[in-house]
UniProtKB/Swiss-Prot annotation:
GO cellular component terms attached to this protein's record: chloroplast; mitochondrial small ribosomal subunit
Location within or outside the cell: Plastid, Chloroplast
Transmembrane among keywords: no
Major place of residence: plastid
Entry protein name: Small ribosomal subunit protein bS18c
Signal peptide range: none
Gene: rps18
Pfam families per UniProt: Ribosomal_S18 (PF01084)
Gene Ontology biological process terms in this record: translation
Length: 71
C-alpha cells in the first residue's frame, strides 16, 4: 500500500491574503482568469474563501482582469 505525500500549502504563514497582493492572487487563477478550485490549490476552506474574496475585490478595483482578452 502506497501513500501519497501531502503537498504543502502554497500560502506561507507570513503571506497576507489581501486584494493588494496581486502576485499571490495570480497563483490562484487560470490563464483565462477563472478562480482555481480548492482541491487544485491544496488550501484549506478558510483560505479558499479569503482568496476568492480578495480576487473578487481586486477584480472590482481593476487590479485583476475579469477575463483574459488575449485569446
Amino acid at each position: 500500500m502506497t501513500f501519497s505525500r501531502r503537498r504543502t500549502s502554497p500560502i506561507k504563514p507570513t503571506d497576507s491574503i489581501d486584494y493588494k497582493n496581486i502576485d499571490l492572487l495570480s497563483q490562484f487563477i487560470t490563464e483565462q482568469g477563472k478562480i482555481l478550485p480548492r482541491r487544485v490549490n491544496n488550501i484549506s476552506a478558510k483560505q479558499q474563501r479569503a482568496i476568492t474574496k480578495a480576487i473578487k475585490q481586486a477584480r472590482f478595483l481593476t487590479l485583476l482582469p475579469f477575463l483574459n482578452q488575449e485569446i
